Swiss-Prot record:
The gene is SHLD2. Transmembrane segments: none annotated. It comes from Homo sapiens. Residues 652-822 are annotated as: Mediates interaction with SHLD1. Component of the shieldin complex, consisting of SHLD1, SHLD2, SHLD3 and MAD2L2/REV7. Within the complex, SHLD2 forms a scaffold which interacts with a SHLD3-MAD2L2 subcomplex via its N-terminus, and with SHLD1 via its C-terminus. Interacts with TP53BP1. Interacts with RIF1. Interacts with ASTE1. Residues 1-568 are annotated as: Interaction with ASTE1. The keyword Nucleus applies. GO terms for cellular component: actin cytoskeleton; chromatin; chromosome; nucleoplasm; nucleus; site of double-strand break. PANTHER family: SHIELDIN COMPLEX SUBUNIT 2. InterPro entries: FAM35A, SHLD2_C, SHLD2_OB1, SHLD2_OB2. The keyword Repeat does not apply. This is Shieldin complex subunit 2. Residues 1-60 are annotated as: Sufficient for interaction with SHLD3 and MAD2L2.
Amino acid sequence: MSGGSQVHIFWGAPIAPLKITVSEDTASLMSVADPWKKIQLLYSQHSLYLKDEKQHKNLENYKVPESIGSPDLSGHFLANCMNRHVHVKDDFVRSVSETQNIESQKIHSSRLSDITSSNMQICGFKSTVPHFTEEEKYQKLLSENKIRDEQPKHQPDICGKNFNTNLFQLGHKCAAVLDLVCSTEKINIGPEVVQRECVPTEYHEIQNQCLGLFSSNAVDKSRSEAAVRKVSDLKISTDTEFLSIITSSQVAFLAQKKDKRRSPVNKGNVNMETEPKASYGEIRIPEENSIQLDGFTEAYESGQNQAYSLELFSPVCPKTENSRIHINSDKGLEEHTGSQELFSSEDELPPNEIRIELCSSGILCSQLNTFHKSAIKRSCTSEDKVGQSEALSRVLQVAKKMKLISNGGDSAVEMDRRNVSEFKSIKKTSLIKNCDSKSQKYNCLVMVLSPCHVKEINIKFGPNSGSKVPLATVTVIDQSETKKKVFLWRTAAFWAFTVFLGDIILLTDVVIHEDQWIGETVLQSTFSSQLLNLGSYSSIQPEEYSSVVSEVVLQDLLAYVSSKHSYLRDLPPRQPQRVNSIDFVELEHLQPDVLVHAVLRVVDFTILTEAVYSYRGQKQKKVMLTVEQAQDQHYALVLWGPGAAWYPQLQRKKGVVLIKAQISELAFPITASQKIALNAHSSLKSIFSSLPNIVYTGCAKCGLELETDENRIYKQCFSCLPFTMKKIYYRPALMTAIDGRHDVCIRVESKLIEKILLNISADCLNRVIVPSSEITYGMVVADLFHSLLAVSAEPCVLKIQSLFVLDENSYPLQQDFSLLDFYPDIVKHGANARL
C-alpha cells in the first residue's frame, strides 16, 4: 500500500444546517470547532485506506445505519447539475473523517426544482471503489488518482461536485421526468438519474444508461428552438432515427390493442427485420404473411453456442442497403386513414426478420432466422476461426433490416398460437447471479430499471470499417438483487422502445459478455433472442402467464419488486391511445410518445441533403418543415417516408387550407362582359328569376358548354364523339368569402355549386317536389342561395387550394384560390383556420 497514490480530501465547515435530513449521529457535520479538517487516505486499485494509526480501516467496512426520510423514495433522487459539466460514475465514494460515521441520507422535497443545466450525470454512493471506467479516463477527471476538493462554507458537497440539493420525492412529477429516459421524443433534455446505494439496508437504483446519444440543451429556451434542435442535434444516423420513430408510433398502437382486447388474436403485428448494413429504412405492406417463427430449433442453437463478439462487430454486408418496415393495418387501423398512407404493399417477404407483435402474453419482440436451414456449419476449432468473419458475412445477410407487418384474421391467430407454444417450453429461467458461463444461453425473467435510447457503434476496423451497428442498453434486476446491463444489438436495439421503467420482461437466449474495456460483465442479445414484455409489474397477474413462465418464479419477482422497489407503485399508469379517438391538439400542449392530429401553417421548409435514409429501396432525403399555429411560435415537423412526397404540395406558393368564413357574394359569369351577382341585397324573387341564366347545357361527358346553331339545335362535342348525350349544369362561380376585415375571391366549380345547393341537380329545377305541390326544386334552390348570402348567415368551413405565381424576389405576381370542398356544419369539422 505504501506505493499507492495519496488522496487528500478537505471538508469545509458549513455555518448553517444543510438543506437535507440527516440523523443525529452526523450532527457534527453541522458545526465543528475548526474551519477545516484534514484526513489522508491511501489509494490502491481496489480500495481506499485511512492513513491513521487509530483507524486503519477499509472504507468497505463502514456500516450504514438505517436511513430516515421518505419511505417511497429510499435514497433515490434526481439532482440538478449546476453549470459545471461533471462526470461522476459508480466508482465514486464519499469519505468522512475518522470521528464521523457515514449516514444514509434521504432527501425530501415537494417539487422538482428548476433545471439550470441538463447535463446531468450519474453519481453513485458506493461502499466500495472499483477501478475507473473508460468514460472517466476520457474525461480525465481522476487522471492522476488524486482529488483535492475544497469547498466554501456555503456549498455543501453531495457528489463531490456542485449539485443542487433541491431534490424531490418520486411521485407523478418524477414519473413524468423519468419518461424522458425511455422516450425517443425527448432529445433536448437528457437527465440521467442519480444513483444511490445504502449497505446493508435496502437500496434502490434508477440509472439512465444513455450512452451519449443526444446533446444536452438548456430548457429555458423557447419551444421553437427546442423543436429545431430536436431534429438537428441527433447524433445517430438518419436511418436509425427513421426506424426509431416508426417503431415508437407502432408500439403506441400495439399498447392500445393490448389494453383493449387482452386476447390472443393478433390484429396489429409489428414485424421488424434488419439486415447488416448501416443504411436501413424501407416501409412496405405485405399482402399476406409467409413468415415462420422457428428461432428455437436445435440446429440453429448448435451453431450459436459461442461468444458473439465477432458476430456483433462484423455486422455489415455491403450488398444489402435497405431495411424495410412492413405494416398491414387491420380493421381497427383502417379507421385511421391517415396512418395508412405511410405504408405500401409488397407481395413477398424475406425470410429473416425481427418482429414486434402483440400476443396473448404481452408484446413479443422476436427474430426470425434461417440459420438452421443454411448449409454452413461452424465449429470452435482454430482453423474455422480464421474464416469465421467471411462466413458471417455470408450468413448474416439479414441482420439489420427492419419490418413491421400486420397480419389479418386467421393467420394472426395461427401466428400467435405459435408464439405462445414456443414460450410454453421456456419454463426454466435463470437468475442473473447464476448467469456465469460464456458458452451457455440463458432465459431471464427480470424487471426493467432503466431503458435507453438507441445509439450506434462505429466499426473502425476490418472489411466493414466505417459502418454502424445499432445498440441499446437496458438495465434490469431480478429477485437475486443482481443488477445487470443488457446490450441489445442491431435490430434488437429497437426493442428498447417497447419497454419502460417497472416492466417485467422475459429475455431468451442471452449470453454473458465481458467488456474488456471497462471490466464489466453484461448480458447481450444473440440472433435467436426474444423479448416478451409482460407489462408493468403493478398490473401483472401471475396466473395469466403460467403457460409462459413459472408462476412461482414470477410471484417471487413481483414480491421482490413490491418490497424493494415500492416507489414504482407511484408511477402513473401508461394510458394507451385509441386509434379512433386521436385528438387535435395545440403544439404547445404536445406530449411525448402521443399520436395526435394538428392543423398547422407551413412557414418554411428545409431539405437536409446530407441526412439520407433508405426508403423503398432508394435513398431519400430528410425533409423538415417549420410550422406554426400561433403567430411567430415555430416548431419543426419532419416528413418521413411517404410523407416526404407531400413536400412539393406544401411549398409556400401553393397549398390546401381550411378556413372558416362567411360567403358574401356569388358571381356567375355568363359572357365576357356579363355576369349575374347574387349577394345579401338580392331579393328572393330576383334570385329565382336568375336561375335560368346561371345554368347551361353541356356535354354529359366532359361538361363543355354546347353552342346552338341558327335553328337552336345544340352542336356536338367533337372531342367526346361518338358520345352525344347532354346535361344541364350550374355555371362556375366566383365566390367572395369574408372573415372580419379580410376577404378573398375563390373559384367554385359546377359540381361544388351543386353540393352547396344540397345536391339538387340543375336539370330538375323546374320539377315539383311532390305531384300535389306547386313548390319546385328551383324555389328551394333560390331559398338556399338567399339563406347562404344573408347577412345573418352562419360562417361555413371552406377547403381551398391556393396557387401563387412568384417572381424572382418571391413577390406574388398572381394568386388564385379554388374551392375543393364545402362544409356547412362547422361544429362537426371544428375548423379554426382564418383568412
